[in-house]
Amino acid sequence: MKRLLLYALFAVIMAGTHALPTHSAEIEGVVYRDSYIADNIKLRLTGVGLLRYWGFKAYTGAFYLEEGAAIDDVLSNTAKRIELEYFRAIKGKDFGPATNKMIAKNVDTPTFDRLRPQINLHNSLYEDVKPGDRYSLTYIPGRGTELALNGEPKGLIKGADFAAAVFAIWLGPNPMKDSFRNQLLGR
């Protein structure tokens, strides 16, 4: 009788695991969760994309936005997250100049100058990446923007204006690539 109960329990457990949804998105073999919880705020996946640079695969990305927020408000003061998984090694010191260039393309000069201390702090947090490493930026209103590498927090930069500027690199009016922005926004 015990054996029959064990078999029945095993069958129920196995049936339950096969019925569970996968809750993820995959692009180029890289898997991203369909949601993320940050400071008790649920962020939903809006889209995933592949960024090519000079014809080479640079990285894949996923963008998460606070549930209930409009996709047109991605740069507003709302919780959001971007994850980028790299296909190539990049030196930490090389992230700063690229970040400066892309922020400057998306904000006016007075705004860039006002944000310079936050941008410099952000750029100082970057470390070398190798293929398979994943950077994330998570913005929580009132808290700031956290940069993490492979899930390990590197630092927190305060300010909704900084968050809008740094997320504009991928989602602003002059992003890294329009096609990548559109993929991240599910368009």
Where are these regions (language model features)?
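Positively charged n-region of N-terminal signal peptides that target proteins for export
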Residues: 1-4
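General helical structural elements
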Residues: 6-7, 185
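Bacterial N-terminal signal peptides
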Residues: 7-17
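Terminal leader/tail segments of proteins
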Residues: 20-187
